[in-house]
């Protein structure tokens, strides 16, 4: 990754040079040498597909989106030289933003819309739980804040995550 890195005191900002809006990682060095890492908000649809150079967008598909988010963050911490795996981190918080289904129409097909919303939320819960069980079984579970919105900036995404994690030295 072609990072622009700025260090200001105990805080290091990692930003892709193509991104002039926000940092992709912000790392704070704590007094005891541990690192507190804040991860960029990421979707598993367009954003992760592009970052991971995948051919197929996971559109409104939490089972594929959720692992892609974590895979992108893992790539970031590796490329930034912070650690090799997300399993080395203790995630403190996950901020999850869920989007409404893109179809069917809630006006013309309310029952089908409700069923699709239920499917997406169930798939999200299962994919999220499976990720921790399969990839980080020895780690504790972070607190999670989930908010549902009408739409995300990535219109193909069902969820966007942000996170705070700790690398204990």
Spell out what each predicted region is.
Residues 2, 12, 19-169:
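Short, polar/acidic, helix-capping and beta-turn segments at strand->helix junctions
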Residues 7, 11:
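Short, positively charged
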């Amino acid at each position: 990754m072609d990072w622009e890195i700025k260090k200001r005191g105990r805080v290091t900002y990692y930003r892709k040079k193509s991104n002039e809006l926000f940092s992709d990682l912000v790392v704070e060095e704590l007094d005891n040498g541990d690192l507190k890492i804040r991860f960029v908000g990421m979707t598993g649809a367009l954003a992760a597909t592009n970052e991971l150079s995948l051919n197929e967008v996971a559109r409104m598909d939490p089972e594929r989106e959720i692992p892609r988010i974590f895979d992108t963050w893992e790539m970031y911490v590796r490329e930034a030289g912070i650690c090799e795996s997300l399993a080395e981190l203790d995630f403190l918080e996950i901020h999850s933003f869920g989007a409404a289904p893109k179809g069917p129409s809630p006006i013309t097909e309310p029952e089908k819309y409700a069923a699709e919303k239920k499917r997406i939320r169930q798939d999200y819960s299962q994919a999220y739980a499976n990720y921790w069980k399969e990839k980080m079984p020895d780690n504790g579970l972070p607190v999670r804040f989930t908010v549902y919105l009408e739409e995300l900036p990535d219109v193909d995404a069902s969820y966007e995550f942000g996170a705070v994690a700790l690398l204990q030295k």
